[in-house]
Regions:
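N-terminal transmembrane-helix/juxtamembrane module of multi-pass inner/ER membrane proteins
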Residues: 1-67, 104-122
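Interfacial segments of alpha-helical transmembrane regions
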Residues: 5-13, 70-98, 161
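Aromatic-anchored segments of alpha-helical transmembrane domains
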Residues: 17-21, 93-100, 166-176
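Transmembrane helix-loop junctions in multipass membrane proteins, especially transporters and channels
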Residues: 27-32, 80-81, 104-112, 180, ...
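Alpha-helical membrane-inserting segments
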Residues: 42, 98, 102, 106, ...
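Hydrophobic, aromatic-rich transmembrane alpha-helices
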Residues: 66-78, 143-148
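Mid-bilayer segments of alpha-helical transmembrane spans in multi-pass integral membrane proteins
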Residues: 96-101, 131, 135
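Membrane-embedded catalytic cores of phosphoryl/pyrophosphoryl-handling enzymes
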Residues: 116-229
């Protein structure tokens, strides 16, 4: 289970990462130079837009909701409890709210806006690149599903974590290659998603809603997930 000490450490670490990234982006520090270099590298690679515009959708909110909500709805209905789906929705609100507030306050343009005359004309109207919502969605929402339906220390939990990491990397690399986000946007998105996920896990644990509270409860969650799938 997530202890208070670990929760505080995780939140503090992600806040520090976000603070550094925001400072570097706003002041155009060394990481901004890295971003510009990464954009030129991605442009020179000329990756297939058709392929990577599909793989980046692993972090698309609509697709994640389409997959997860029916499963969570089924489990909530069968258990006659709002807890499974409510936790997911709280994570969604947290990460969307944090990411949205940062997008508005930082006001950063997208890499592709350098690519054509028309896109450059849009500068000043569409400055919502930082942080990446796709990266935040991937960590927060897929991460919640892994946490809720697996037991700590189990093979399924470890496999699920690695799948979330893999999906997050695919989203990040895809977004970089098709130049929809700067690398620092993606790192910030990961931090936002992780902080939202950890906050909700901490909340559920503090309220006694953690599915690992009893062995019986955890086994029931496994059975219901299998039924829903």
């Amino acid at each position: 289970m997530l202890t208070t000490r670990r929760l505080n450490a995780y939140i503090a670490a992600t806040v520090m990462v976000l603070a550094v990234l925001i400072q570097q982006v706003v002041t155009e520090g060394l990481l901004s130079d890295f971003d510009r270099s990464a954009r030129l590298t991605a442009r020179s690679i000329r990756a297939s837009h058709d392929v990577f515009s599909v793989t980046v959708m692993l972090g698309l909110r609509g697709i994640i909701l389409t997959v997860c909500l029916p499963i969570l709805g089924w489990v909530s209905l069968k258990r006659r409890s709002w807890l499974p789906i409510a936790g997911f929705l709280i994570v969604l609100v947290f990460e969307t709210g944090i990411a949205g507030a940062l997008k508005i306050s930082v006001g950063r343009i997208f890499p592709y806006q350098y690519e054509s005359f028309f896109s450059r004309m849009m500068i000043g109207q569409d400055e919502m690149a930082f942080p990446s919502g796709h990266a935040a969605n991937c960590v927060a929402l897929w991460g919640y599903m892994v946490w809720y339906f697996t037991q700590a220390g189990s093979v399924l939990r470890r496999a699920g974590i690695w799948l979330v990491v893999l999906a997050s990397c695919i989203v990040g690399v895809s977004s970089w290659l098709i130049r929809t986000h700067w690398p620092t946007d993606l790192f910030a998105g990961y931090a936002v998603g992780f902080s939202a996920l950890v906050a909700v896990i901490g909340l559920y644990t503090a309220l006694g809603f953690n599915p690992e509270a009893t062995t019986h409860y955890s086994q029931e969650a496994h059975r219901e997930t299998a039924d829903a799938q």
